[in-house]
Amino acid sequence: MLTYPPVKKVSVVIPVYNEQDSLPELLRRTDTACATLGRQYEILLIDDGSSDDSARMLTEAAEAEGSHVVAVLLNRNYGQHSAIMAGFSHVTGDLIITLDADLQNPPEEIPRLVEKADEGYDVVGTVRQNRQDSIFRKSASKMINRLIQRTTGKAMGDYGCMLRAYRRHIIDAMLNCHERSTFIPILANTFARRAVEIPVMHAEREFGDSKYSFMRLINLMYDLVTCLTTTPLRLLSIFGSVIALLGFAFGLLLVVLRLAFGPQWAAEGVFMLFAVLFMFIGAQFIGMGLLGEYIGRIYNDVRARPRYFIQRVVRQPETASKEEDRS
């Protein structure tokens, strides 16, 4: 079995978007949890274009004497996964842990992830126990998890939980991928030799509201479908072929019925004909929309614009020099 050297340094990557209320508690609890590891550590917080006071608070935390905080400030909002990738580009640790800023996944779980990674796993995922979310969020999450499992064949139970640990070579492999539509847990699993999940606690959100609106969840679902596989396009072709055959058979049936019962019968069936026609037209629009999603993502990738733009990185001078040496 492949073995890895012991983890000497842990990097915690946290995307932040309008989380000024939770930041003091987040910084305190994360630093306390990392201090118990008995290893070097750093806490990278990426401000994803916040409109509140988050950027200033992160900058002050990073500039404080003896701080383990690194503030990565993006010029605008790029989304959770792009912000995390921006953080990945500045980590210096052997093991990288991602964590949400809303404190629903307690930072106190970090030592358990490090302990599990020490057993030789490339990726350590988590499954939220007693999940404190709305019925809509739970249902959407279950549907997305099943879709991912069927498409990828990777039987992991909770892809939506961002409390995860990745070995350094997994991070380097993901940074070499340049597609704009990225879902980090899935991308990481494509490079992992050994992956495992552990149960973790899930708390109610104490500060602010969820940043995932209904439309953001829909967009995430499209990202998942289009970045995972081209199977929907194949299904679309099969579905179109079935519809064409049914339409041809239905047309023959109408001709036979007209010959058998006369033109009066055909007039009485006009509403059913329109109903079937609208069904076919609706199916065509669904197919065109799905095809448009793929073409739009190809267009974005061909333009080769960066996934994010880092406006400023604030860290302690000694860690800054180490990061420069690594790069």
Curated annotation (Swiss-Prot):
Q: Which UniProt keywords apply?
A: Antibiotic resistance, Cell inner membrane, Cell membrane, Glycosyltransferase, Lipid A biosynthesis, Lipid biosynthesis, Lipid metabolism, Lipopolysaccharide biosynthesis, Membrane, Transferase, Transmembrane, Transmembrane helix
Note the superkingdom of the native organism.
Bacteria
Q: Which SUPFAM superfamilies match?
A: Nucleotide-diphospho-sugar transferases (SSF53448)
Q: What is its main location?
A: membrane
Membrane topology classification:
Multi-pass membrane protein
Question: What does the record give as its pathway?
Answer: Glycolipid biosynthesis; 4-amino-4-deoxy-alpha-L-arabinose undecaprenyl phosphate biosynthesis; 4-amino-4-deoxy-alpha-L-arabinose undecaprenyl phosphate from UDP-4-deoxy-4-formamido-beta-L-arabinose and undecaprenyl phosphate: step 1/2; Bacterial outer membrane biogenesis; lipopolysaccharide biosynthesis
GO molecular function annotations of the record: phosphotransferase activity, for other substituted phosphate groups; undecaprenyl-phosphate 4-deoxy-4-formamido-L-arabinose transferase activity
Extract the NCBIfam families matched here. PRK10714.1 (NF007986)
Q: Which family does it belong to?
A: Belongs to the glycosyltransferase 2 family.
- What does this chain do? Catalyzes the transfer of 4-deoxy-4-formamido-L-arabinose from UDP to undecaprenyl phosphate. The modified arabinose is attached to lipid A and is required for resistance to polymyxin and cationic antimicrobial peptides.
What is this protein identified as?
Undecaprenyl-phosphate 4-deoxy-4-formamido-L-arabinose transferase
Organism of provenance: Klebsiella pneumoniae (strain 342)
Q: What is the lineage of its organism?
A: Bacteria, Pseudomonadati, Pseudomonadota, Gammaproteobacteria, Enterobacterales
Which gene specifies this protein's sequence? arnC
